[in-house]
Amino acid sequence: MQIESDNQVTNQSYSFFRQENTILDDKKFMEILQKWGLQHSIKVSTFLFDIKFDHLNPNQFLLDLFNSKDVRGSLHYVSFKQNVLLSQIKFQPLTCKSIKLDLFDKLTEDKIVVKGHIKQCFEEQFENIQIADELRKALVLEDSEQYCVFNEADRQELLFKLFQILVLGGQLCQYEDEIQAYLDWTKYLYKNTVNARKYADKDEIYIDSYAYDIRKLENSYSSDHPQNVMYVVVNPSLRIVNIIENQWLKVW
């Protein structure tokens, strides 16, 4: 379900302050991103915000976020009009429930991954993305039998969205024959984006984060390719918001 915000006046207004983000400073992560053709396309920005996050009214938060000068000056793939504030944003709420990678056990159960190896298939193209194995079919080819491995609820998990970015890669991508590297680095990116907390009264962990898939920023940004994505991840107890951007950069 996509939501279109409007610029309604509320009693609160958020301010945002740029913070250093070290997710992309990890040498091994950058090496694998280079292998997957993502080293120049994937970006992560972090900001502090000043007042309590109202999860019942994400519209106001997102409008204030993308109208902030600090945020506008930090994003890589949005063409904001100077001195023109946004009044509308189309976005889709995502779920952040996963604390393990068991979402991807389905790949083994459905024989897309066998003993850690990704099952190969005849090569085809989808939106200039090379589809040469059944994993990529399961991610983006809606008319394939592999696509039904993940249901709609699975696909609206932030964990799934991050996994898809890494698996599909960029135009100059050296794909993996085995699944483990995709799982390991999805876990790394997810772990460093969301806020995991422990319940006060029991020894269990939960994710204290809210995530949003930004579909369109009025006259400034539109997601028109499977790899053109922007996710906003709000960590209320830390008053930190992370913005993950990726673009399909054409090499030829």
UniProtKB/Swiss-Prot annotation:
GO terms for biological process: inner dynein arm assembly; outer dynein arm assembly; positive regulation of cilium beat frequency involved in ciliary motility. InterPro entries: CFAP300 (IPR029416). This is Cilia- and flagella-associated protein 300. Its main location: cytoplasm. The gene is CFAP300. It comes from the Eukaryota. Keywords: Cell projection, Cytoplasm, Cytoskeleton. Belongs to the CFAP300 family. It is found in: Cytoplasm; Cytoplasm, Cytoskeleton, Cilium axoneme. One of its GO terms (cellular component) is cytoplasm. Cilium- and flagellum-specific protein that plays a role in axonemal structure organization and motility. Plays a role in outer and inner axonemal dynein arm assembly. Disruption phenotype: RNAi-mediated knockdown of the protein causes reduced swimming motility and velocity. Display a reduction in the cilia beating frequency and an altered cilia waveform. Show absence of the outer and inner dynein arms.
